[in-house]
Regions:
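Short, polar/charged alpha-helical segment
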Residues: 63-81, 175-177
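Conserved C-terminal helix/tail region of periplasmic/extracytoplasmic solute-binding proteins
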Residues: 83, 338, 352-442
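Extracytoplasmic/periplasmic solute-binding protein
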Residues: 153-168, 178, 192-240
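Hinge/lid segment of periplasmic solute-binding proteins
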Residues: 39-52, 114-167, 197, 308
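Extracytoplasmic "Venus flytrap"/periplasmic binding protein-like
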Residues: 74-144, 149, 180, 282-283, ...
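Extracytoplasmic/periplasmic substrate-recognition and gating elements
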Residues: 152, 298-363
Length: 442
């Protein structure tokens, strides 16, 4: 996903993954697993035969028998005779339900970090002790590994060129702009003039089409991403309340000026997704999840979907801002088939094992999503939302904190940021307590 709405946590990042197989008799050092192309565009994993006939359990809310990964799961089982079984756990109460399974001795093998960071650390195994992972392989995204580590010990991973991370971007309804003779975001981008000011210009012109039009949906966290800043930082295995950062204040003022002017809406829910699809909204600050066949805009004609990077704060900025959801995968404590699960993750997270037409609305949209990997000079990873949800374990509970800002006005931003900072102190403390507890037991 992050890039994520205030009412949901979708949200990462790109990462690469490789595995070790068992070494020869008498050696405790595994041999690096080398994927080879077998001629049908998928990956062959040497050394996997030892796990034939076994089952890997995957805790997720997605029915992958019907998702964009359906063919990938089926081909893995067909090639390697390893069954993948879903353990269904709802997205919004994932942490609490998973913790209950672990406590009851019913641990799945694979777990998903999807906006709950760092609440899943206590139920995750350290990956450096699983012999079929080679975490130094450049298939893995080292940025994700660093975030998914405590005191240098890795717990979570993802791949660089994976379909299972979500990159921040701006989506716009081409038809709204073309039918009304409004200069489009892409035209500004092609002029190298795609900034927060021209974003506002686009939103203003759309909003003037009528009282039922919204210029742009801009969630608070995505406004911060545009300004290159996070509400909660994670550095050196420690969370830091970053609400006092000047750029956070600048992002909030920019957002709330747009709200006050009735050109921005800071909330995105299902009705708002429909408003964009139906042509009553110009732009959405979202992620490339919106370009997926399974995404919230799937009812929209793909020819009407426009997409481009988030705008620069200043035209002179060297780079367009880049953010990724902190989507990552781990092996659960108590997993019964961790080594085979590692092989499956290597296969599942490799975009080469997918048909692009099963994932994105078009090949062009797929190319755009992955082109943002090339822009990842210093991508922001979405860690803030998980910290704000940590006290109750519900993935959508951060919205109540965001309302401290979004339910007010631009004139009140400075005062409201102080309240916001005070309100989340308990969340930051609990997040750091989790890190300390897990780190102390390594």
């Amino acid at each position: 996903m992050k890039i994520k709405s205030l009412l949901s946590v979708l949200l990462s990042l790109a990462m690469v993954i490789s595995l070790f197989s068992l070494a020869g008799c008498g050696s405790d050092k595994p041999e690096k697993l080398k994927p080879t192309n077998d001629g049908d565009t998928t990956t062959t994993l040497s050394g996997i035969d030892e796990y034939k006939g076994t089952t890997v359990t995957f805790a997720t809310w997605v029915d992958h028998s019907k998702s964009e990964a359906a063919a990938t799961w089926a081909s893995f089982t067909e090639k390697y005779d390893i069954t993948i079984k879903t353990v269904n756990i709802g997205q919004w109460n994932y942490v609490n339900k998973l913790s209950g399974l672990v406590a009851a001795g019913q641990s799945p093998d694979i777990i998903v970090e999807n906006g709950n960071f760092p609440a899943l650390f206590p139920v995750a195994q350290r990956l450096d002790e699983i012999k079929t992972f080679d975490l130094k392989d450049d298939f893995w995204d080292q940025n994700v590994i660093n975030y998914g580590s405590i005191n240098g010990v890795p717990y979570f991973i993802n791949a660089v060129n994976t379909p299972w991370t979500f990159r921040g971007c701006i989506l716009y309804n081409k038809k709204v702009f073309e039918d009304n003779g409004i200069k489009s975001p892409m035209e500004f981008y092609e002029e190298d003039n795609w900034t927060i000011d021209t974003f506002v210009e686009c939103a203003t012109r759309v909003s003037k089409l009528g009282s039922d039009y919204v210029g742009a949906f801009v969630p608070l966290e995505n406004a911060c991403n545009i300004f290159g800043v996070k509400l909660v930082e994670y550095k050196d295995s420690k969370f830091i309340n970053n609400v006092g950062n000047d750029q956070v204040a600048a992002a909030c003022r920019w957002l709330m000026n747009g709200v006050d002017s009735k050109i921005f809406n800071p909330i995105i829910g299902n009705e708002d997704f429909a408003k964009f699809t139906s042509g009553k909204t110009g732009m959405v600050a979202y992620s490339d999840y919106g370009l997926r066949i399974s995404g919230p805009f799937r009812a929209m004609d793909s020819k009407d979907m426009g997409y481009l990077p988030m705008p620069k704060v200043s035209a002179s900025d060297e780079h367009y801002p880049v953010s990724n959801s902190l989507r990552a995968y781990g092996i659960c404590k108590g997993a019964r088939n961790a080594e085979a699960a590692a092989y499956f993750l290597r296969y599942f997270l490799d975009y080469e094992n997918y048909n692009k037409n099963d994932v994105f609305i078009s090949e062009e949209a797929s190319d755009f999503a992955f082109s943002m990997n090339e822009m990842n000079h210093n991508p922001l990873l979405g860690t803030s939302n998980g910290v704000l949800c940590i006290l109750d374990g519900l993935s959508d509970s951060a919205a109540k904190y965001y309302k401290t800002i979004t339910d007010s006005s631009a004139a009140q931003v400075a005062t409201n940021l102080k309240s916001f900072s005070n309100n989340i102190e308990a969340c930051v403390k609990e997040a750091n307590d989790i890190i300390d507890r897990v780190g102390g037991n390594q």
